[in-house]
Amino acid sequence: VSRATARKAMEMLANDGLVSKKRGYGTFVISAQPNTSPQRVVRYTRKNRVDQVIAVKRMINQKVMKAPKDIAECLQLSDDCDIIRIKRVRYAGEEPFYLEINYFEQSFVPEVMEHDFSKESLRVFLSNAYQIQWSFAKQKIYSILADREMAELLHIAVGSPLLYIRRISFDKDNHPRECVCTYYRADTYHLEIELAI
């Protein structure tokens, strides 16, 4: 490929917003995943909601483990740090509709392991036991396909679409204290966002 052809191709990519040129540094690929800033997430709404169906959370497991690299980065921890992972599924009657996984630094909230959060509110416990004052959260939203474990827990086929939301919550001192990964069944949920225009 000639230099002229390569230069023209890079110009076209830059015009399409796929790469960014910085004088003295070179050309950089821009992430294909949009980084939007909605004014307000209004709600996650169940489709075809049935009145008077009792919603419950069922515990899958709760354990202390070494932080996976991505979770360590979210919580600004070293890779060898111990974390608590709480994995639960939310049901409406007998139908599962989302999987929720909470991660915390183990030394920050050690008493979490002594409680059953299928019956008790995790947020209320954190507020009462540790007086955590939440300041803000950062959230990313993806569309993914269910792997075998997710499919089994949510009673769907492997490869079914899921709405995956990762939220990192910060305390009043701007420290990331909780990472929550939630996997919503795309056939039961949609996301409503309010935007300023």
Model-derived features with residue positions:
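Residue-level recognition of specific faces of alpha-helices
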Residues: 9-12, 28, 47, 100, ...
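Residues at secondary-structure transition points
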Residues: 4, 36-39, 117
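C-terminal all-alpha effector/ligand-binding and dimerization domain
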Residues: 54-197
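N-terminal helix-turn-helix
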Residues: 1-29
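Acidic/proline- and glycine-rich, intrinsically disordered low-complexity segments
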Residues: 45-49, 124
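Short, cationic-aromatic polyanion-contact patches
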Residues: 28-42
